[in-house]
Every structure is written in structure tokens, then in C-alpha cells.
Amino acid sequence: MKNKLIAKSLLTLAAIGITTTTIASTADASEGYGPREKKPVSINHNIVEYNDGTFKYQSRPKFNSTPKYIKFKHDYNILEFNDGTFEYGARPQFNKPAAKTDATIKKEQKLIQAQNLVREFEKTHTVSAHRKAQKAVNLVSFEYKVKKMVLQERIDNVLKQGLVK
């Protein structure tokens, strides 16, 4: 009798101990994914400098064959990997705008002139303004096809309203 009672009490204590340790371990594991107090600021020769002024030497063991993947992206283009190491990420690609040639500048000026003449035609509704605006729109380059179509639609809308003699 006593042996059965002792065995049952030991089993219950073991079950309670196991559940408390699993709950405690899951609570500790969830803390790692929240906001960090220490954030890496720079990396120089495998020495990571953190924002609180501390340093850490990092090394990835040669025998570590687990695949390396990005765990977290920090500020200053610093990547944290699953094995705890840090590296700078790829440099961002900036496309520099090409220098405008004289031909493109002239094409843009023709477009601006056409826009101004169409605006004037919308105000005046005269035949001479229509001729100037239509000629300017016809001279706009094919590279500005969409803008050219918009200008032509604006001219057509004014023509539907009628001209002033």
C-alpha cells in the first residue's frame, strides 16, 4: 500500500516538474524574437560593435554544416544569421539617371511648348490658337506618346465646344 502511494506521488511530482519546465522553456524561447536592447552598429574584421558601446568577436566554426540563412535585418544594412554571426548585406543598387543630351532637351522643350499652346487654346477658343496648338502637338516626339494623346484629346474637347470667330 505504502509503495503504491509513494509511487503515485513520485509520478505526480515528476509530471508537475515536466510541465513547469516546458512552460518555462517556451516562455524563455519567445523572448528572443522581440525588440533587442543591443543592436549592431558596425562590423570590422569579425568584431561587431553594438549601439551600447560593447564589442563581440564572432566566428563561425568550420565544422558547423547547418545552412546559413538571414534571421533578422538590422539598421545600417547589417544582417544577422541563424548561427549568431553578422555581416553587411548587399549594397543597394542606385540607378543614376542618364545625362540628358541636347536632343532630349529639345524634345522636352517642344512638349512644354505644346502644353502651353494647348492651354492657351483652351482659354481663347480661336482658330489661330488652334492652328498653333495642333502644329505643336504634331511636332511632339513619339517618345511622349501618352502625353501627346492627352494633349490631342484636350484639343478635341475644345473643338467639340466650338470655336470663337
Curated annotation (Swiss-Prot):
Residues 1-29 form the signal peptide. Gene3D superfamilies: Sbi, C3 binding domain IV (1.10.10.1270). It comes from the Bacteria. InterPro entries: Efb_C_sf (IPR036233), Extracellular_fibrinogen-bd_C (IPR021033), Sbi_C3_db_domIV (IPR041909). The keyword 4Fe-4S does not apply. Keywords: Secreted, Signal, Virulence. It is found in: Secreted. One of its GO terms (cellular component) is extracellular space. One of its GO terms (molecular function) is complement binding. Interacts with host fibrinogen alpha chain/FGA. Interacts with host complement protein C3. Extracellular fibrinogen-binding protein that plays an important role in virulence. By interacting with the alpha chain of fibrinogen and its derivative fibrin, enhances a non-functional interaction between fibrinogen and platelets and is responsible for repression of fibrinogen-dependent platelet aggregation. In addition, assembles a fibrinogen protective shield around the bacteria which results in impaired phagocytic clearance by the host. This is Fibrinogen-binding protein. The lineage of its organism: Bacteria, Bacillati, Bacillota, Bacilli, Bacillales.
